Amino acid sequence: MGDPHPRRRTEQVRDAVLTAAGELMLEGGLAAATMEAIAARAGVSKRTLYKYWPSRGAVALEGFMRSAASSWSLPENAPAAESLEELVVAAVRLFTQTPAGPLMRSLIADAQSQDEIATAIRDQWLRPRRAVAAELLRQGIASGEFRADLDVEVTLDLLFAPVYYRLLLGHETLSPQFAVTSIRHLITGLKG
């Protein structure tokens, strides 16, 4: 007898595969995220993987983006400045304490010539973080924590740019302390 809920089964399989791919990418990078390893960890066949994803790169990228995007949480009922600091520090920890840093550098480089990767980075990594940060900025403006004339879009770029600058160029150490210092300098300007 067939599964009475095939859509649920499909969602469960996709979830298991993406979880496995994300874990493998964070544990050992793209080299660890082979189709065999993903299938074994997810408990599915390689054929099932190819049913939903055209390549190892596609499933690994989607799994990594999903895992990386869920790697942060914010303090509850905290001032906007504190939550913004935690958001940026969480990204720095991910980049410096897991293989995500070198992976993200490679993905950003590849995104310059591969639209699929650029879209995945924007949709699954940047936009979710920017949306959370934008809401925090708006809350800070509404509560009087930040200046009323704040340009949210420009501030979002200022918030994250120092992290990506150090991640991509490596001219100085990227560390949680650097992120905290950078954010605190920015917050001083936001308060006016």
Predicted regions and their residues:
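Short amphipathic alpha-helical segment with a characteristic S/N-K-E followed by hydrophobic residues
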Residues: 17, 32, 55-60, 70-71, ...
